[in-house]
Amino acid sequence: MRNNDDAWLLVIDPQVIFAAPSSDWAAPRFDEAMDVITGIAPLFGDRVIVTRWVPEPPYRGSWQAYFKRWSFANRPSDDPIFALVPAARSLSRFDPVDLPTFGKWGRRLESLLGPTPNLVLTGYATDCCVLSTALAAADSGALVRVVADGCAGSTDENHAAALHLMGLYDPQIKVVRSRQV
């Protein structure tokens, strides 16, 4: 495992939609994970990227059924529900990477970080966007560490299940605690 000298902290979707208790997608441990994220971010200096999930109509294929099921999230991308939470706004010197997909790894991040970066993943929700990002990044050759206590799932059970699944990809994906970063 490489050290943090070349590692990038990727903070997945620290947005109001996952933080607000009134949201259908509220992550019950959002604040606990955010405390971990803000605690480890200084270890990465300028190597921090924050992402946002934002819808991008018109919806094609399975996204049509998805937004029928989760109609509350079918809003303009500038709706306040998609804003970064205050604690995330100053984490990165870069503008947030906005994408309409669960997985954030792809051409945009690859152009910023290179094809096979050393990634440290945190964010929301463990069982959706973090999982999707980790698998795609590892599949393309990135070394991925997922900070278990720097993520929050839709439920504690789903969080644990997603961490278990990602742990099956060792050595490409390692699940660690913040004290190991």
Where are these regions (language model features)?
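Active-site-adjacent betaalpha module
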Residues: 1-8, 36, 42-43, 72-181
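N-terminal nucleotide-binding beta1-loop-alpha1 segment
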Residues: 8-14
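Early exported N-terminus immediately downstream of N-terminal targeting peptides
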Residues: 47-48, 52-71
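Conserved protein kinase catalytic core
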Residues: 19, 58, 155
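Short, glycine/acidic-enriched loop or turn micro-motifs at the edges of active sites
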Residues: 16, 55, 152
